[in-house]
């Protein structure tokens, strides 16, 4: 993610708690050798649900992800950050 002081953008609420890095991007997507192109793996298991927030047109173009408690727990993997960035998020709260 890029460093900045102020960011104004559209929010996307992720109303889930205890989201670990394997839910953010499953291990099957970690085989790439580049640091880009991970957006297809972002929340891939949940994206099968047509009601999942990423499919909501009201949140299209959101750059701020409002996450629940314990977001990003689990094994350390920079791919989770890359997937969020590649989707277009600039801020995670």
From Swiss-Prot:
Organism: Actinoplanes teichomyceticus
Family: Belongs to the LeuD family. LeuD type 1 subfamily.
InterPro entries assigned to the protein according to its UniProt record, in alphabetical order: Aconitase/3IPM_dehydase_swvl (IPR015928), AconitaseA/IPMdHydase_ssu_swvl (IPR000573), LeuD (IPR050075)
Subunit comment: Heterodimer of LeuC and LeuD.
The protein's enzyme class: lyase
This protein's pathway: Amino-acid biosynthesis; L-leucine biosynthesis; L-leucine from 3-methyl-2-oxobutanoate: step 2/4
SUPFAM superfamilies: LeuD/IlvD-like
Protein origin, superkingdom: Bacteria
GO annotation terms (biological process): L-leucine biosynthetic process
E.C. designation(s): 4.2.1.33
Keywords: Amino-acid biosynthesis, Branched-chain amino acid biosynthesis, Leucine biosynthesis, Lyase
Entry keyword annotation includes Lyase: yes
Protein name: 3-isopropylmalate dehydratase small subunit
Function: Catalyzes the isomerization between 2-isopropylmalate and 3-isopropylmalate, via the formation of 2-isopropylmaleate.
Cytoplasm is among the record's keywords: no
Reaction catalysis annotation: (2R,3S)-3-isopropylmalate = (2S)-2-isopropylmalate
């Amino acid at each position: 993610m890029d460093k900045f002081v102020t960011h104004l953008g559209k929010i996307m609420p992720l109303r889930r708690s205890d989201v670990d890095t394997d839910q953010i991007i499953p291990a099957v997507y970690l085989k790439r050798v580049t640091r880009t192109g991970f957006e297809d793996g972002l929340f891939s298991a949940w994206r099968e649900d047509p009601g999942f927030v990423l499919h909501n047109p009201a949140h299209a173009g959101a750059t701020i992800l409002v996450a629940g408690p314990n977001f990003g727990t689990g094994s350390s993997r920079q791919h989770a950050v890359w997937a969020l960035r590649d989707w277009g998020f600039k801020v995670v709260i």
